[in-house]
Amino acid sequence: MELLPHEKQVVEYEKTIAEFKEKNKKNSLLSSSEIQKLERRLDKLKEKIYADLTPWERVQICRHPSRPRSVNYIEGMCEEFVELCGDRTFRDDPAVVGGLAKIQGQRFMLIGQEKGCDTSSRMHRNFGMLCPEGFRKALRLAKMAEKFGLSIVFLVDTPGAFPGLTAEERGQGWAIANNLFQLARLKTPIIVLVIGEGCSGGALGMAIGDVIAMLEHSYYSVISPEGCASILWKDPKKNSEAAAMLKMHGEDLKQFAIVDVVIKEPVGGAHHNPAAVYRDVRDFILREWLRLKDLSIEDLLEQRYQKFRTIGLYETSSESSPEA
């Protein structure tokens, strides 16, 4: 597993404990109580390190090569999954994986953005950067869900929509805008979960829903930290400062009413205990589905409209208001 800079001290401590345990099999260097004491110190060290992570360190966790991706969540949560492909206009976009899913006996239309896990699959998936056909594919499946009375689950994980010339020629901006328009008035419950990177219009094109959740170390932002640093300071190396300024993580976005729920991750990130994350995400989906399914279509659409209508509102106190 690839090591992040802030993980080195933890890994060295873990190796030391493992060496003591191995030597103890031949010579009793430490008692079991002393080993347990070292393990408790390790737990405290982990808690301290991961409680004091900077925004940039959390971005690194979010981008960890071993972090679970959409296909992993599908395998970990679903009893059944039937993939549906193509946009019925141009071609299939491998950066989107979607289809009919069964979770705890309940049927959903599950649509996820997929980056890939190694060099060949990342190239095949275009590193999770959607082309116009990817957005059209997602919308086609969403409308199919509406037609058959299925709730929709979107899994967001993208560094952004594909910025290439071919994507622009095929109407990238229009495809994203049309998704925003169509998803806002879709007559079925929509649950959105940001599981990794949620960057710019590439994320927003699949993030219109009745409830929006994020994993603890995922991020949701108008731009990547590197892109922000390049624009503001002409220096992509100032990504740490940009990550802090963008307020891109769950606790900040929840205060701004951009996201509704932040799902805790295991200590160190989702890649350290994927099974626990699959369970928590599954439970969240089922809990929100139970809440949304009994709403009338009128109430569902009105709440969705008001949710996005109020994003960006702010209040000023009368004391700070200029006198007439």
From Swiss-Prot:
Record's keyword annotation contains Lipid biosynthesis: yes
Keyword Amino-acid biosynthesis on entry: no
Subcellular location as annotated: Cytoplasm
GO cellular component, one term: acetyl-CoA carboxylase complex
Catalysis: reaction(s): N(6)-carboxybiotinyl-L-lysyl-[protein] + acetyl-CoA = N(6)-biotinyl-L-lysyl-[protein] + malonyl-CoA
Group of enzyme by EC: transferase
EC numbers, comma separated: 2.1.3.15
Pathway: Lipid metabolism; malonyl-CoA biosynthesis; malonyl-CoA from acetyl-CoA: step 1/1
The CoA carboxyltransferase C-terminal domain, residue ranges: 37-291
Source organism superkingdom: Bacteria
Gene Ontology terms, MF aspect: acetyl-CoA carboxylase activity; ATP binding; carboxyl- or carbamoyltransferase activity
Pfam families cross-referenced by the UniProt entry: ACCA
Subunit (UniProt): Acetyl-CoA carboxylase is a heterohexamer composed of biotin carboxyl carrier protein (AccB), biotin carboxylase (AccC) and two subunits each of ACCase subunit alpha (AccA) and ACCase subunit beta (AccD).
Similarity remark: Belongs to the AccA family.
Protein name: Acetyl-coenzyme A carboxylase carboxyl transferase subunit alpha
Organism: Chlamydia abortus (strain DSM 27085 / S26/3) (Chlamydophila abortus)
GN (gene name): accA
